[in-house]
Design a protein with these regions (language model features):
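Hydrophobic, membrane-embedded alpha-helices of multi-pass small-molecule transporters
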Residues: 29-38, 46-113, 149-158, 244-254, ...
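Transmembrane-helix boundary/entry motifs in multi-pass membrane transporters
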Residues: 93, 134-148, 175-182
């Protein structure tokens, strides 16, 4: 119900759910560093076959942090407005502050998760996803109490994500139709989320990973473009060309993941840097951005 009233999002998520989640994660994180289950061992499976760094980066798509950052900025601004913070400068200030705190907290969280994964050899055998490893690790550390800690972490993490994503989607889609209001979209997306969640994490990842391989590079380049926006001599040219090239090459990465890429194109792409690591889009996208800046200066003159 509080998702339907944006003014209650900050008080519910910011003052109750997120602090409780952070406390549980802090307990787990400290315990992992104090009493790791295993020594750090060499990477295995995909992390051993390819570069551990690039494999980790692509796996990081599943966090959807960049997509969330793009969407949640509007939610923060909307929630602040509902709290009678209407001064644009203050909204920008508070949004930047919230983003800075998020970066610090996420950095600490991921560092703890990195160490957890690196020392999980004792419980990682047979696991099909990171969620299973995390659950086994916590249960091994805390015993019976670990079950309750995991239940709390999963519940709070799911609820905070649900609130943020659903509110962002509701806010976005309500702008395109007066017939379907913000509350309608909140109810609709909540119902869809409930149905889709029944398929389980492993099955969902099989569907979402190819989609993220297509979408996530665009989100990354949009953030990069926004960061250098003031340096772009011809903004429209840089945006259109960079995103177009990113889409083309990220589509190739997505089709490769699905084993649907034509063999001829695959042979050609093996000559491109980072293609075999699943990052075929990176170099072409950055090169296109640089070239668009050079041509933009020429056109401006």
């Amino acid at each position: 119900g509080f998702m339907i009233r944006p003014s209650t999002i900050i008080s519910t998520v910011g003052e109750v759910m997120t602090p409780a989640l952070l406390v549980l994660l802090l307990v787990v994180g400290i315990t992992v560093f104090v009493s790791p289950l295993s020594d750090i061992v060499a990477p295995s499976q995909a992390y051993a076959e390819n570069s551990a760094l690039t494999t980790g980066l692509i796996s990081g798509y599943q966090t959807m942090d960049v997509l969330a950052a793009i969407a949640f900025g509007g939610i923060v601004a909307r929630a602040l407005s509902a709290k009678n913070v209407t001064n644009p400068q203050k909204i920008v200030k508070y949004t930047i502050s919230a983003g800075f705190v998020s970066v610090i907290l996420l950095g600490c969280l991921y560092f703890a998760l990195f160490y957890l994964g690196a020392t999980s050899d004792a419980v990682a055998q047979g696991a099909t996803n990171g969620g299973q490893i995390f659950s086994r690790y916590v249960n091994s550390l805390f015993g019976t109490a670990g079950t309750w800690i995991m239940a709390g972490i999963i519940t709070l993490a799911s609820l905070t994500t649900l609130v943020g994503v659903t509110s962002a989607c509701g806010d976005y889609f309500s702008k395109f139709s007066t017939r379907f209001s913000y509350p309608f979209w909140i109810v609709f997306f909540t119902a869809m989320t409930t149905i889709i969640s029944q398929y389980g994490l492993t099955k969902l990842l099989r569907v979402t990973i190819p989609a993220l391989l297509l979408i996530y590079p665009m989100a990354i380049m949009l953030v990069v473009l926004q960061l250098v926006r003031n340096k772009l001599p011809f903004i429209r040219l840089s945006y259109y060309t960079t995103i177009f090239v990113t889409v083309c090459f990220s589509l190739i990465d997505s089709l490769k993941n699905l084993d649907m890429l034509p063999e001829g194109l695959h042979q050609i792409m093996t000559h491109f840097p980072l293609y075999l690591q699943g990052l075929a889009w990176l170099v072409p996208a950055l090169c296109t951005l640089v070239l668009s800046m050079i041509f933009g200066k020429t056109i401006s003159k």
